[in-house]
Amino acid sequence: MEGHLLAPFLEKDLEKEITFPFLALLVSGGHTLLIKVSSIGNYEILGQSIDDAAGEAFDKTAKILGLPYPGGPQIEKLAKQAVFKKYIFPRPLMKNLKHNNLNFSFSGLKTFALNTFDKIKQESLINKNINLHQEKAEIAYAFQEAVTDVFIKKCKQAALSTGIDKLIIAGGVSANKYLRDKFNSLEKEIKLKTYYPSFEFCTDNAAMIAYAGMQRLLKGEHSPLDT
């Protein structure tokens, strides 16, 4: 995950702009981590998922809605077709936020999506006016909105409690434009400058691993060839 964390440094115009310390929200199919980064290799985990990673929840919710893999881009695309925005999904682990409860939980959102869609399908057997495709779009929007809202509030609390005014968001989920737009609004609200990798560097790639390795080498660190 260090490669994802440092991916924005691959951008020429950002390499000198991003200074330590900063916060990092790493969101992928396998991980969801909120980290305080003091220097290369000096990381403090402030919060993490206690069940499904965010990207995993996107994939599973997409499967529930009959969408192909990978689910993240499919959910984002379908959510743009939402018109009524009538569903409100829960925001897990938001109690005691002011006491720095910065962990995440997304398995319940997936289950909520499943139960909501199952109920709609049952109703559609009786009410032929129900547009299942539109209902899927409404669910996709509500799910995406809930995940993003949790990220926003947790990162805001982390910034306020640490006094850090820079945030990197990286990993596959960071390619979501809805998420980026919402964090741009947060930047104006609390002056939290947010950085992202280019879209081509959001998913796993060799460039970010090479950069992370180079930074370790510059620090004089070496790894045995057999590891």
Predicted regions and their residues:
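Conserved phosphate-binding catalytic cores of ATP/NTP-utilizing and phosphoryl-transfer enzymes
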Residues: 1-22, 212
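A contiguous, well-structured pocket-lining segment that forms one wall/lid of small-molecule binding clefts
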Residues: 77-167, 176-190, 217
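Glycine-rich beta-strand-to-loop/alpha-helix junction loops that act as flexible
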Residues: 28-30, 167-176
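Conserved phosphate-binding/catalytic loops in two-lobed NTP-binding clefts
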Residues: 166-167, 184-209
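Glycine-rich phosphate-binding/hydrolytic loop that grips phosphoryl groups
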Residues: 4-6, 197-227
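Glycine-rich phosphate-binding loop plus the immediately following alpha-helix
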Residues: 2, 38-83, 109-119
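Short beta-strand scaffold segments in enzyme catalytic cores
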Residues: 6, 24-26, 32-36
